[in-house]
Design a protein with these regions (language model features):
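Short, compositionally biased
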Residues: 84-98, 102-108
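Short, positionally conserved secondary-structure boundary motifs
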Residues: 1-64, 95-96, 103, 118-119, ...
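Residue-level "contact hotspot" at macromolecular interaction interfaces
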Residues: 64-68, 81
Length: 142
């Protein structure tokens, strides 16, 4: 995980939001109307002072679900209370990692999406904290 500074609210800039669902086939010319405008601040950032960007490294979260690819930009909110099922940035024994959080009566685990990587059970005596909850993933195709 590469770290970036806290989010500064971007200048408000609205982009056209097309109301039609985009099929992964041939587009329909009848669906060329706008639903409204979209502000990326409103979409991605709920609490600017507690929001950071981090860049993912590795492929432990590249699996069956919507995945996190190597190089993806993650939006992380440190003010959110983590819960089971959330993708989190965790610090375990001084090392940061991005994993899915699983909490049960038997313990706490950090779960990779990629089955080639082991589940990490948090053991007594380990230095562990949740640094923030991942709220969005930004991937670039080029």
């Amino acid at each position: 995980v590469d770290y970036y500074t806290p989010v500064q609210r971007l200048l408000a800039r609205r982009f056209p939001l097309v109301s039609a669902r985009i099929e992964a086939g041939f587009p329909s010319p009848a669906d060329d109307h706008l639903e409204g405008e979209l502000d990326l601040n409103e979409l991605l950032i709920q609490n600017a002072p507690a929001t950071f960007f981090v860049r993912a490294r590795g492929d432990s979260m590249n699996g069956e679900r919507p995945t996190i690819q190597d190089g993806d930009l993650l939006v992380v909110d440190k003010s959110r209370t983590p819960k089971t099922g959330d993708v989190v940035i965790a610090c375990l024994d001084g090392a940061f990692t991005v994993k899915r959080l699983r909490c049960t009566a038997e313990g706490v685990w950090l779960m990779p999406e990629n089955k080639a990587f082991p589940e990490i059970r948090i053991e007594a005596g380990q230095e562990f904290c949740i640094w923030g909850v991942v709220t969005a993933r930004i991937s670039q195709f080029h």
